[in-house]
Amino acid sequence: MAENTLLDGKRVLAVDDEQDVLDTLVDLLPMCELVTAPSFEKAKELLESQPFDLVILDIMGVDGYGLLEIATRKNIPAVMLTAHAWSPDNLVRSIKEGAVSYLPKEELTNIIDYLTDVLIAKKEGRDPWKSWHDRLPVSYFEKRWGAAWKDTDKQFWETFKAGLKAKRAASKKEE
């Protein structure tokens, strides 16, 4: 089974106040039933009235964290996609508030890989952050945020890393 087929027919809500980003997602995800929303209000209305398999949320301009709260409450996996809110603080907040991935818009062309990783992890009962961590290694963040980027929230990152290791060990036992 080609990994792409996991996305076939999935209902995905993409929310961004930049129309060119929404247009790019439409072009990149033709296998999905992609619904787009340019505002918090429109996205909130859609989230509360329609079923979705995944959501892709910008942070700035559309109150992405408000939408993340709704998606999390409805058990819809949420991928945060951002340019202006690309920071260690927003990464930590996204994880803590229930997002399953956090991507810089420069990774938009690889969105199929990230969404597929999320669906595979969900299907296998694994933590989607493990695949994310593999695709965007620490060196990626060090180049953008400096070598000490984890220092301000050291306890969080130690707990996060330990959680990934524990989940990995548990999934290996099941195999």
Q: Which residue stretches match the model-derived regions?
A:
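Two-component/phosphorelay signaling modules centered on CheY-like receiver
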Residues: T5, Q19-T36
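Alpha4 helix (beta4-alpha4-beta5 surface) of REC/receiver domains from two-component response regulators
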Residues: G66, A85-P104, T109-D113, D117
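A short, hydrophobic beta-strand element within the central beta-sheet of small alpha/beta folds
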Residues: I56, M60, L68-A71, N75-D89
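Alpha-helical interaction/dimerization surfaces of two-component signaling modules
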Residues: T24-L29, L46, I70, R93
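Acidic di-acidic motifs
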Residues: A14-D17
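Acidic, metal-coordinating helix/loop segments flanking the phosphotransfer/catalytic sites
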Residues: Q19, T36-L54, V62
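Phosphate-coordination loops involved in phosphoryl transfer and adenosine-cofactor binding
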Residues: G9
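C-terminal output/effector regions of signal-responsive regulators
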Residues: I120-E175
